[in-house]
Amino acid sequence: MSGFKIRDEMNGVREAPGKTWFWELEAGVIDAGRCIQCGTCVAVCPSDSIAIGADDLPVLAKMCTGCSLCWDFCPRGGLRYEATWTLVDGLENEARAAPWKITGADPGEHNGNGTRPVRAVDTVRERYSARSRQPVAGGQDGGLVSALLIALLDAGEIDGALLARQSETERWKAEPYLATTPEEVRAAAGTIYNQTMGLGYLDRKLLSRRGLPPDARLAAVGTPCEVQGIKAMHARPWHRGSSKVDNVVLTIALLCTKSFNYEKLMVELVAAQRGIPLEAIGRVDVIRGQLVVQDHERTTIIEEPIKNFHGAALKGCDECADFLGNAADLSVGSVGSADGRSTLLVRSEAGSRALEIARDCLELRDLERPEALDKLDRLDKRTAFKTLKRPFDPEAPMFIDYLEHLERYAGSDRAPVVADR
């Protein structure tokens, strides 16, 4: 029996107006195959009714109260994610979100409204190619993120960092982790290419388990969609208590065009189809459009175009035009910098402060290839604009009603699916 039918048969009680239930999120996002596993719905639920299922997707763990928040804050549901781009402080704020700058048109081309697009990478406060001065074992592209977090921990600027580390039980599967020491940050260094439902992991009980006070200051490292959820929750007035992400004082987005399903990518495509035991893998990277897998001796055992693995990508990622992580205080990734370095984009006062604290630990030089960032940013936007079934507008209201979503997506390959339970 479907969740909708159960609800409709509940003692004939008329539904209060304006409610959106978990079942709508389930139909419009999860069962429609559009969930991007950011964990925002788990984090935002005030009654802790949503949990993380065995398949790493949101599930209803107890009665839904119909508060609508899981729908409202989902980047594939009711959250107009591009509206979070305007929530970053700084003079470039308005310019970065202006619609005529995000159409995906080539620089120099008119957009049909009398204006010319400006590269999004040109709207940040600062931009560098950077790496850690000290080697970080296993660190990605110069260990920049690890060095930043360690410097902030050492300075007492943050008490912990929400990040991803490799699972202790499933090889090459990422899991969320709250690191509270430089040693824990170093142990989690490197990139793994599946989502972790990370925001669903963060709550006050976690702080207590990790020996942190209720007012602990945290950095969050994640994909742009995770940052979108954090910034949206920060912007909402919480009349009862606070949100579970109030402790996050710094967001670091990892440049991202898509994330992958662990089972499909590592278990099926890598281990089963290509005959590579997961325990034999020492490193996985995406370098210049190639998926590169190496063994523990750094011998390359797979080097193929990443497009060969797109069947394992999360379907909902195609709707995201936020490769650069435009809502984040800092964005970091390999595109635009030479091997062994990371691109660092600074957008906010919090980002500038973090960089200043960590500056002595980093080697900074001018961003080497901003045009590479711009090219991939425009390609990412074009893909999203073709895939989205709704208008893309950072200046529109932040939240999208479920009925509006239903109207936009009905009849498409991303239409809501009501599954029997």
PLM feature spans:
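A broadly conserved sequence feature marking short terminus-proximal activation segments
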Residues: 1-45, 272-290
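Iron-sulfur cluster-binding cysteine motifs and their immediate structural context
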Residues: 18, 27-36, 40-59, 69-90, ...
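Short, flexible, mixed-charge glycine/proline-rich loop motifs
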Residues: 25-29, 33-37, 63-64, 305-312
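Conserved structured core elements
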Residues: 35, 39, 64, 68, ...
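N-terminal, well-ordered alpha-helical segments
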Residues: 43, 62-65, 72, 146, ...
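Conserved hydrophobic beta-strand within the GNAT/NAT acetyltransferase core sheet
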Residues: 59-60, 220
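Alpha-helical scaffold segments in carbohydrate-active enzymes
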Residues: 66-69, 73, 257-261
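Iron-sulfur-associated redox domains of electron-transfer enzymes in respiratory
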Residues: 84-421
